[in-house]
Design a protein with these regions (language model features):
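Nucleotidyltransferase catalytic core that binds NTPs
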Residues: 1-186
């Protein structure tokens, strides 16, 4: 079974945090490949601030072209919109039946995961790797054990979950695409 990580996002724009995390994930987990899934739109974000999808796709390809095991995917571009993660994962399973998919998301997203469409389906059927999105997690970088602990949100306490793993040691990057766009407009 081929283990593929799905690291989805608008990548609007792609930045060193995305690239650094992708490199760390492929080097420090059991994934065979990490696919950066460029989303044509995010149902939880405003679409009017997005750069054209082909521009974002090209920028992500350029940013990770030299990282072995990291690929860029436009798979969601051919799916009905808006692009919901559950639909994407369902379609990936259909097209790649011999692959196992793991969702790679930020700690900020797992906190609101119960707002995602069909989040129960995702939790029950796919592994989820959670990377740090705040400074406290930076204390873990490079350590074999870590005091920064991650606990599943309260809404997940009584749910059937395939695997929910916090990526201890993953680097924290104090940057976001939202912050970059805000700086560019001022």
């Amino acid at each position: 079974m081929h283990n593929i990580g799905i690291y989805g996002g608008s990548f609007n724009p792609v930045h060193f945090g995305h690239v650094g995390l992708a490199k760390w994930v492929i080097e420090n987990t059991d994934l065979d490949e990490l696919w950066l899934m460029v989303s044509p739109n995010n149902p939880l974000k405003e679409a009017d601030s997005l750069a054209p999808e082909e521009e974002r796709l090209a920028a992500v390809r350029e940013a990770v072209k030299d990282i072995p095991g990291v690929k860029v995917s436009d798979f969601e571009f051919s799916l009905p919109r808006p692009s919901y993660t559950a639909n994407t994962l369902r379609a990936l399973r259909k097209y790649y039946p011999d692959y196992e998919f793991t969702l790679v998301i930020g700690e900020d997203n797992i906190a609101i995961f119960d707002r995602w469409r069909e989040y129960e389906y995702i939790l029950e059927n796919f592994r989820i790797f959670v990377y740090p999105r705040h400074e406290a997690a930076n204390d873990c970088a490079g350590l074999s054990h870590c005091e920064h602990t991650f606990s599943a949100p309260e809404w997940a306490e009584h749910m059937l979950i395939k695997e929910l793993r916090f990526l201890n040691g993953a680097p924290y990057f104090d940057i976001s695409s939202t912050e970059i766009r805000a700086r560019l407009t001022h």
